[in-house]
UniProtKB/Swiss-Prot annotation:
One of its GO terms (biological process) is DNA-templated transcription. Its cofactor is Mg(2+); Zn(2+). One of its GO terms (cellular component) is DNA-directed RNA polymerase complex. Zn(2+) binds at C74, C76, C89, C92. The lineage of its organism: Bacteria, Bacillati, Cyanobacteriota, Cyanophyceae, Synechococcales. The keyword Transcription applies. In cyanobacteria the RNAP catalytic core is composed of 2 alpha, 1 beta, 1 beta', 1 gamma and 1 omega subunit. When a sigma factor is associated with the core the holoenzyme is formed, which can initiate transcription. Gene3D superfamilies: 1.10.40.90, 2.40.40.20, RNA polymerase II, clamp domain (4.10.860.120), RNA polymerase Rpb1, domain 3 (1.10.274.100). Mg(2+) binds at D471, D473, D475. This is DNA-directed RNA polymerase subunit gamma.
Length: 633
């Protein structure tokens, strides 16, 4: 697929994150220019020249490595304009191209000594420690130059492979080796720092270790077995991804493109820069100093100290604060490392890649809507008019209320009555999706029929709260409008709240009344001990139907907990056992039976003619509500 700039778009299925080999790290940043020159290595800590405000060559913003900072213009200004596309300036070595290449071209820093990757060393679990089958404390002692490690015991009987030695212990062994009467021919080899770690990891034969571990697992149990399985799992993953353990030790560090760590000039002439530039500068300074010390054959203790400082600088770049003191900038603020940019809610993945803004969506606080049906939600008019605007405009034009989109938008801004009427027509039967973050299971997004409400809060039925894990203490929910007919149908058929009664995890009902609803139901159906029961036929307390009771309650002629006689032909609980308390045969042959909480009139054959029950007004309200809800459902 090609667009107007003739750029090819690569379609991909997935993103896979694996360990990168040193060669691959170099290949990300290393490029061969059309004139045959190889560029990519960042060797200077400088960013820009403060007099010319142009990037320094071979620095962190170098135009030769990352591309020109102005479209179609080289560093020295010899070549300008698009007609010189692809030419490499013979004076400054900058390729004439678009400046946007500075968003994706990378560089690299070739390290004077290997350094360990802090994620694999200090992560939980520590993969380096698991692979080497050593305690993490011991591995740290090696990496941060506190202890030597035996890489080859040679002819020395007291040494073992991977044994740790302090400085004093190694000096004693050296004296022993180089003594005049020494019988040791094959000298032991020890190492320190990330170089020693790299050597230990290189010595691992993963396939052989995996076979040995499988044999050991069959004959072991308990905690030892769990530890072996843990190690085997890590080794199997390395084998499956064709990654080598020594790649966890870095020989080169990639430098991300300069436009992703920009430097901008402020009004006062000062510069604001990304924290990454400071962290990269520390690494380059220490790396260059180490290279110079190695060149002049400086004493081992000085070189070793510089290597440790380089290790700490790379640790801070990758994950500041994971180990040791946190590197701080001006006003004692911790610098944001690569890990800080990637991880967390504000990180690159959750904020920018997964959390993109979506058209036809809104967000507002939720409040309880007890008068709603379970499949309904209250949508503020202000939100609805914005979300359904294209549909409203289309209908306004189709009904010849307006002639064009501009006139329709003006009418909508005035919130005309006609607009509200059209909006009501549009949302009828058009489901919307409500989502509450975090969406931990499929019931985190459900469909509802919108009902227009005043105010600015979304109204939600209290019964659907457990599915969303929502409460009404300031929670917010997002609204999405399904546009296509297919998506609307799916929302109605599969996602409607009244169709999602059971939890997908347990199969038990997730729609269960709780808190206020339980309390309300209890209060509604409670019996007041001091309330007196009326006699049958009392005009103020005897009613012909449930509706009459509710009308009398709404007119405030009776109270919620008053006892009433009401005619009711439905099923009742047979809470009376034995004989009726009073029985009487009338002149027409019919019989009256008086029970504790009901009064029945039966014909000569004993069939029920009419029934009055003694109950409270609250119970009538509850019963009437349930019957209405079931009848609609």
């Amino acid at each position: 697929m090609t667009n107007s700039n003739l750029r090819t778009e690569n379609h991909f299925d997935y993103v896979k994150i694996t360990l990168a080999s040193p060669e691959r790290v170099m290949s990300w940043g290393q490029r061969t220019l059309p004139n045959g020159q190889v560029v990519g290595e960042v060797t200077k800590p400088e960013t820009i020249n403060y007099r010319t405000l142009k990037p320094e060559m071979d620095g962190l913003f170098c135009e030769k490595i990352f591309g020109p900072s102005k479209d179609w213009e080289c560093h020295c200004g010899k070549y300008k304009r698009v007609r010189h596309r692809g030419i490499v300036c013979e004076r400054c070595g900058v390729e004439v191209t678009e400046s946007r290449v500075r968003r994706h071209r990378m560089g690299f820093i070739k390290l004077a000594a290997p350094v360990s990757h802090v994620w694999y060393l200090k992560g939980i679990p520590s993969y380096v420690a698991i692979l080497l089958d050593m305690p993490l404390r011991d591995v740290e002692q090696i990496v941060y130059f506190n202890c030597y490690v035996v890489l080859d015991q040679g002819d020395h009987k007291d040494l073992k492979y991977k044994q740790l030695l302090t400085e004093d212990e190694w000096l004693e062994i050296e004296d022993e080796i180089y003594a005049e009467d020494s019988t040791i021919e094959n000298e032991p080899v020890v190492g320190i720092g990330a170089e020693a770690l790299q050597q230990l990891l290189e010595d691992l034969d993963l396939k052989e270790i995996a076979e040995t571990l499988r044999e050991e697992i069959t004959g072991s149990k308990g905690q030892k077995r769990a530890k072996l399985i843990k190690r085997l799992r890590v080794i199997d993953n390395f084998i499956a991804t064709n990654a080598r353990p020594e790649w966890m030790v870095l020989d080169a560090i990639p430098v991300i493109p300069p436009d992703l760590r920009p430097m901008v000039q402020l009004d006062g002439g000062r510069f604001a820069t990304s924290d990454l530039n400071d962290l990269y500068r520390r690494v380059i300074n220490r790396n260059n100093r180490l290279a110079r010390l190695q060149e002049i054959l400086a004493p081992e203790i000085i070189v070793r100290n510089e290597k440790r400082m380089l290790q700490e600088a790379v640790d801070a770049l990758v994950d500041n604060g994971r180990r040791g003191r946190t590197v701080v900038g001006a006003n004692n603020r911790a610098l944001k490392s690569l890990s800080d940019i990637i991880e967390g809610k504000q990180g690159r993945f959750r904020q920018n890649l997964l959390g993109k803004r979506v058209d036809y969506s809104g967000r507002s606080v939720i409040v309880v809507g007890p008068k709603l049906k379970m499949h309904q939600c209250g949508l503020p008019k202000e939100m609805a008019i914005e979300l359904f605007q294209p549909f409203v405009i289309h209908r306004l034009i189709r009904q010849n209320i307006v002639n064009n989109i501009k006139a329709a938008k003006k009418l909508i801004q005035r919130a005309d009555d006609e607009v509200m009427q059209v909006l009501q027509e549009v949302i009828d039967g058009h489901p919307i999706l409500l989502n509450r973050a975090p969406t931990l299971h499929r019931l985190g997004i459900q469909a509802f029929e919108p009902k227009l409400v005043d105010g600015r809060a979304i109204q939600l039925h209290p019964l659907v709260c457990p599915a969303f894990n929502a409460d009404f203490d300031g929670d917010q929910m997002a609204v999405h409008v399904p546009l296509a007919i297919e998506s609307q149908t799916e929302a109605r058929m599969l996602m409607l709240a009244s169709n999602n009664i059971l939890s997908p995890a347990t199969g038990e009902p997730i729609v269960t009344p709780s808190q206020d609803m339980v309390l309300g139901s209890y209060y509604l159906t409670a019996i007041q001990p001091e309330a007196s029961k009326p006699d049958f036929g009392d005009q103020s307390k005897t009613f012909a139907s449930l509706d009459d009771v509710i009308n009398a309650f709404e007119d405030k002629r009776i109270k919620l907990h008053d006892w009433v006689w009401v005619r009711f032909n439905g099923e009742v609980d047979d809470d009376d056992h034995g004989e009726p308390s009073h029985s009487e045969t009338l002149e027409d042959g019919t019989r009256i039976e008086q029970w504790n909480l009901r009064r029945d009139r039966l014909d000569e054959q004993g069939a029920l003619i009419s029934r009055f029950v003694l109950t409270t007004v609250g119970r009538v309200v509850m019963n009437h509500t349930i019957i209405d809800a079931v009848a609609i459902a």
